[in-house]
Amino acid sequence: VQKARELKLPIAFRVVVDGRDQGANTPQFVYDAGAEYAMSEPKYPDRKTPMPQDPIFQRYYEKFVAALAEEFNDPEYTSFIDGYGLGKWGEGHSVAYNKDDVSAVDENTETVKREVLDWITKLYAKHFTKVPLVINYHRVLGHPTSQGTANPNSESLVALAISNGYCIRSDAFGMNNSSWGYSTWEKAIAAQWRYKVPIIMEGGYIVSSHSYWNDPAGYRQGHPEDVRQGEFDSSAEARVNMMDFRVGQETESWFNDAFRL
């Protein structure tokens, strides 16, 4: 953050609370105060997953977002905020609501996930009034699963976020796997909302570390420019308003491997 400010560059970010994939992301004092959590791998005690519907967690999270806005609710410093951040990697899938089983789905799941999404999007919208807020349009948005066919309520959850003041983004551009990539459902959502709200793209592959050549699109190994072309084509189809080049190496790849785009 400090380096970006030295360079006079605005930043974009999401706040991740789930510890399954990265280690501790929610402070221990929140759990010490009584917030419920799941621990899917007991051998890694720091990898806790807070229950987003828990009132204690929500109380601390509300204080955090309010404090965050005091510093970052400024377009000079902030390009946009991905204001959901639940689930693995904060991508909005694999969201756990059962402390005993992070994958559990029951008769209350659809109600709880809608209530949580409504709460968190209204929270960010209350405090971030000067910078864009976005949500990942994921086929299993807010659900305990991570892939497969689209949940029938995902479309309405995207619409709910938009009604609360959000734009939309996807971090799977260029990925063509029908179970977890940027496929038919995602394209339909973009088509539904383009020209109505801004759309932001992020490429799904980090070409320096992901096996992008296994993608159904037939990207050639050793040819990251193939991935860049795939991302570009999907972005053009979606009519994106901004291309988020992700980590530093990805920015270098765009300029070195696909400058003509």
Where are these regions (language model features)?
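Aromatic-lined carbohydrate-binding surfaces of glycoside hydrolases
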Residues: 1-115, 129, 136-148
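Generic structural signal for well-ordered alpha-helices
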Residues: 2, 65-69, 117-125, 185-189, ...
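Structural recognition of the beta-strand scaffold that forms the well-ordered cores
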Residues: 11-15, 79-82, 132-136, 198-202, ...
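Acidic, His- and aromatic-enriched active-site or binding-groove loops in soluble protein domains
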Residues: 42, 100-130, 158-174
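Substrate-binding cleft of secreted/luminal carbohydrate-active enzymes
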Residues: 152-261
